[in-house]
């Protein structure tokens, strides 16, 4: 079943708790939590304290996307904050990605890697045995509300082939410019999880939008 992970980066920050509380009833599967440090990407968002504050408000998995230079420094803080999934960028300053993924698993969380639009899937195939998921960025990271990059579809198909060839259970997650039209194309290409921010939180009826994204 296709999972939908609304990105709270696009929620009303003044009513964040209320928005998160509503997500399960609206049909969401995960809560996507974007962490930006102002260095790896040109924006600053949330940290472990926000995750900790939101944790009691939902039993949905919290999917933390670390857009930071040194992701290993944040494994323990996000474990303590109640995160369920932690993904790290292959483009970060993390020189020991295998070790980082193993540390995330040792902390009791699911682990994955993230690829920016310009990064080929070859950068992550050797990591697939350690990955519960691979997040493919379909926009350049840093800000919400961007348009989907069509080349992502080719990357999804190629990554799906690599995963299947290795007999892995790794999920493919897509983040950026996801709407009902692009969602359908991503699912057809082999995606399992769709991150949607503006599409969900700006919709007149978020529950209906989540149903439309799932297809």
Where in this protein do the model-derived segments appear?
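Conserved N-terminal beta1-alpha1 strand-loop-helix module at the mouth
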Residues: 1-87, 92-99, 105-111, 124-131, ...
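Short, electropositive alpha-helical surface patch
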Residues: 84-91, 187-196
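Short gly/ser/thr-rich secondary-structure transition/capping motifs
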Residues: 114-118
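A short, acidic/glycine-rich surface segment
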Residues: 119-123
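Short glycine-rich anion-binding loops that position phosphate/pyrophosphate groups of nucleotides
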Residues: 139-141
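Short basic/hydrophobic patches in alpha-helices and adjacent helix-turn junctions
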Residues: 158-162, 185-188
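Glycine-rich beta-strand-to-loop/alpha-helix junction loops that act as flexible
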Residues: 174-177, 195-199
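Acidic, divalent-metal-coordinating active-site segment for phosphoryl/phosphodiester hydrolysis
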Residues: 177-189
């Amino acid at each position: 079943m296709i999972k939908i992970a609304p990105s709270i980066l696009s929620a009303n920050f003044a009513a964040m708790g209320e928005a998160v509380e509503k997500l399960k009833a609206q049909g969401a599967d995960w809560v996507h939590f974007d962490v930006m440090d102002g260095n790896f990407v040109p924006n600053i968002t949330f940290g472990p304290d926000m995750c900790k504050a939101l944790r009691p408000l939902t039993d949905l998995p919290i999917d933390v996307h670390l857009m930071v230079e040194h992701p290993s420094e944040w494994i323990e803080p996000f474990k303590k904050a109640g995160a369920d999934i932690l993904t790290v960028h292959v483009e970060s300053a993390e020189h020991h990605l295998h070790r980082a993924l193993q540390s995330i698993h040792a902390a009791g969380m699911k682990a994955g890697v993230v690829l920016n639009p310009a990064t080929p899937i070859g950068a992550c195939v050797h990591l697939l045995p350690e990955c519960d998921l691979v997040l493919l960025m379909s926009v350049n990271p840093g800000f919400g509300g961007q348009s989907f990059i069509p080349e992502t579809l080719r990357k999804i198909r190629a990554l799906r082939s690599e995963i299947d060839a290795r007999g892995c259970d790794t999920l493919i997650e897509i983040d950026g410019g996801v709407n009902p039209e692009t969602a359908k194309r991503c699912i057809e290409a082999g995606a399992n999880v769709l991150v949607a921010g503006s599409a969900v939180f700006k919709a007149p009826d978020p529950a209906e939008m989540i149903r439309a994204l799932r297809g």
